[in-house]
Amino acid sequence: MPPIPERASAEWRRFDADHLIHPFTDPLALAAGGGTRVVTRGEGVYVFDSDGNRLLDGLAGLWCVALGYGRSELIGAAERQLRALPYYSSFFHTTTTPAIELARLLCERTPPGLDRVFFGCSGSESIDTVVRMIWNYWDLEDQPRKRILLSREFAYHGSTVAGASLGGMSNMHAMSGVLAGVAHVMPPYAYRYGRDETPEAFGRRAADAVEERILALDPERVAAFFAEPVQGAGGVIVPPESYWPRVQEICRRYDVLLVADEVICGFGRTGQWFGCDAFEIRPDFITVAKAITSGYLPLSAAVVGERVARTLERKGGRLAHGYTYSGHPAPCAVGVATLRILAAEGLVERTREETGPYLERCLREAFAGHPLVGEVRGVGLLWAVELDRDAASPLPPEGELGLRCLAHCFDNGVVLRAVRDALCFCPPLVIRRSEIDEMVEKAKKSIDRTAAEIGVA
């Protein structure tokens, strides 16, 4: 008997409605819209649902399926490891070879000075790990007042209590509040916060806002600044070139640790191995997940810089932190295979030199002068098309245009993501030019239909 029985789509949707709680979903709206789409298989850059529809996955699952669907190398790596050793912990002075090898390969690729790895299962866990290490570090350095964690509006750092607090998403804060000692500052989001100024001037102003917030909070109390190189789930917010050099100088001046959340940007998405490489960031920590296994199995890592690692190792004693699945051998084996494929197939370089520039050109040409498009922005294979709410009359609530357009995208056979009123593009790194053409064509068709519905021409 197969482990998953054959059922009609309607029956799957009924069981789903009866039993499954969906993340970031309004259950009443889901029911009113006819329930879930049941995705049954994937191949390359396409997924297929239980009704037989084929959709081009322009979001790589959830920003993670970098190598596309159906990679036999990853499936084989998981199977071989599950047969040899399906589980063992990294507690009690034990380890496994896949965890060691993946940690070694990671440290070969990460920015200089990051050479200690702690594994988890999700980006959220890696953020929590870093938070605990930061507080422990400052305690060991006899600066226990350094407890405040600074992040940015529209940031996304996971869904645990710490991650949701650090994130700059108001709907998440409304659900469970914000941890004491977490503060936020404006992001380098020129479309929303920019004035009549050059990108360079705006980047400096956004960076200066970080300094002003640190000074207002008291530098002797601020422990760390958390930031994504490019804010992905916040709407693909790409900072001006002047932003990151200034932010790093500010963090050094006030002795504030810098945490780069690479969960979306990592492993080639920006055209470099890490977003830190694209923006010349030298952080004290990075967090990774998602594409580390191309999404095939859950895995994350907190990669720790020498300064912090040295203190924790020399002064910290026994590390009172860990997860049952830290360094699980099967995901680590898939992670090793993923990194080797990224390198062997030159996908990082291809993103930087070929497919990334091609996607940019296609998007800019498709939406140049479009009456409903306010901005096209991005880097590598991470892009957004921001819809202009001001073009509609009457002015719709924020997010309404994005959701309307997203529904048309699904109808037209392409999976994207709407963040407020921005459509986000994050296809698998293996995408071909013809598939980029198809993705952009279907997105434009969806935006054109939205514009026609609201009378924008």
Short names for language-model regions:
Residues M1-A457:
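Conserved N-terminal phosphate-binding loop of PLP-dependent enzymes in the Aspartate aminotransferase
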